Amino acid sequence: MMRSHYCGQLNESLDGQEVTLCGWVHRRRDHGGVIFLDIRDREGMAQVVFDPDRAETFAAADRVRSEYVVQITGKVRKRPEGAVNTNMASGAIEILGYQLNVLNEAETPPFPLNEYSDVGEETRLRYRFIDLRRPEMADKLRLRSRITSSIRRFLDENGFLDVETPILTRATPEGARDYLVPSRTHAGSFFALPQSPQLFKQLLMVAGFDRYYQIAKCFRDEDLRADRQPEFTQIDIETSFLDESEIMGLTESMIRKLFKEVLDLEFGEFPHMTFEEAMRRYGSDKPDLRNPLELVDVADQLKDVDFKVFAGPANDPKCRVTALRLPGGASMPRSKIDEYTKFVGIYGAKGLAYIKVNERAKGVEGLQSPIVKNIPEANLNNILDRVGAVDGDIVFFGADKFKVVSEALGALRIRLGHDFELLTCEWAPMWVVDFPMFEENEDGSFTALHHPFTAPKCTPEELEANPATALSRAYDMVLNGTELGGGSIRIHRKEMQQAVFRLLGIEAAEQEEKFGFLLDALKFGAPPHGGLAFGLDRLVMLMTGAQSIREVIAFPKTQSAACVMTQAPGLVDAKALRELHIRLREQTKVE
């Protein structure tokens, strides 16, 4: 072997021993005729000292530069008093180098590895192989590996089988656009890359495998955000003969064990909250419980006021009027209020009403707001009592369609929590349950809130009679306002699956064309089953404190779904297109 130890393995117990290291020159220093090289490998860093007494080795050390790949042999010794570096795991020792072999030279990197804060993300992605040398980046990928190992170990110990499902499959309606792959052997036909292994894992339950898992690559051709990539990794789990409480208990144990093993954090039992309560109190189906701010409905106090902005929504069952109190916010300048007004506009809000509570004892005179003149004093007091307002607070209001108010004030709640440093703890895991089966569109049609294979909490007849009020057997695990994973009990009876398809506007012929294999499987003794899928990239992002999932993926795509390093996607030659029976149309030039 070319090395005897990794740099990160060196410590005082090796004092006096000979070691051989392989790695990159992180930094070179020349102090008073002695050369110091900081050598870096994937496990850490070590300081190597070269004395001029060994002329040949000293000369070789004098020639090396940053990022040269080297092999060094030397003797471990304790550092002199006062020279210990507490920032390095091996900081109590150094190596007296007496043999140096340059394995490869290196040009000057496009950016220094220890000064990366001003380097643009595109440059970092173009030279990702350099960027990944930084200890901060290597640490994230190393932690990712520990996370997947812990999860695999837990699932293996609990009787789950790791089964691979196809990557080349057919398009199914799962909400986002599919990545399509043309078939050379079936002219005019296309495979689709899977958005999830959903149907295959259900078929594995029909086949009797009982407990399945897979760390699966999934693909979605959608607009990208900070927590989205066109290809992402999913921890996919499915079980038979367990109900939702048992599946939630099992996967909660897995996450608790993971955080204990990897971060040495003890989580208690995760609280449960219904979808309806989460939307009402937090304006989100993935609330961040670290934030103490809450939305409070006040429509009943504003139905009869002579102020249409409030009275209209207050009397409309499809709308809501909500208050959000910010403790100590009365000193907020108008410019900041305008900034927050612009912010909620992103979510469709037409404005942001507010009341500053300067001195409640003075009644209306102690309140500062353009809206107080339109609301009777008794109603104002009821509202302020309900939200718990005291002197020095500011209360914001939203009045509009339920979805607009929930999203706008829910987002404002999160923004205020961060801007005013209100978070009360570092971690807040929870479960959200009792989701609606469907979302009703403007035209009265329905869309599956999760996916079309989620089981409802009712019979097919009850579902078709009252689809708008039907609840599903779905559950989401949420951590710090981020959905870690979502799952449900699945439909295992053909009649129920057909009823759901009908409500989604998928008629019998289309059902047979797109889902005939699933409907067939449900006829042949499908067991009760359910599961859950975790987003691995998001989980690693939270556990490492990264700002984006691009920071925890070795070779991510940009926000335009491109790889600047390999220049993918790229053009292909005409011969390959002909073999695939594809002809490119000329793009119309816009003058």
Swiss-Prot record:
Its EC number is 6.1.1.23. The keyword Transcription does not apply. Residues 198-201 are annotated as: Aspartate. GO terms for molecular function: aspartate-tRNA ligase activity; aspartate-tRNA(Asn) ligase activity; ATP binding; nucleic acid binding. PROSITE patterns: AA_TRNA_LIGASE_II. It is an enzyme of class 6 (ligase). It catalyses: tRNA(Asx) + L-aspartate + ATP = L-aspartyl-tRNA(Asx) + AMP + diphosphate. InterPro entries: Aa-tRNA-synt_II (IPR004364), aa-tRNA-synth_II (IPR006195), aa-tRNA-synth_II/BPL/LPL (IPR045864), Asp-tRNA-ligase_1 (IPR004524), Asp-tRNA-ligase_1_N (IPR047089), Asp/Asn-tRNA-synth_IIb (IPR002312), AspRS_core (IPR047090), GAD-like_sf (IPR004115). The record marks H31, G82 as: Important for tRNA non-discrimination. Pfam families: GAD, tRNA-synt_2, tRNA_anti-codon. One of its GO terms (biological process) is aspartyl-tRNA aminoacylation. Homodimer. Aspartyl-tRNA synthetase with relaxed tRNA specificity since it is able to aspartylate not only its cognate tRNA(Asp) but also tRNA(Asn). Reaction proceeds in two steps: L-aspartate is first activated by ATP to form Asp-AMP and then transferred to the acceptor end of tRNA(Asp/Asn). This is Aspartate--tRNA(Asp/Asn) ligase. It comes from Pseudomonas entomophila (strain L48). The lineage of its organism: Bacteria, Pseudomonadati, Pseudomonadota, Gammaproteobacteria, Pseudomonadales.
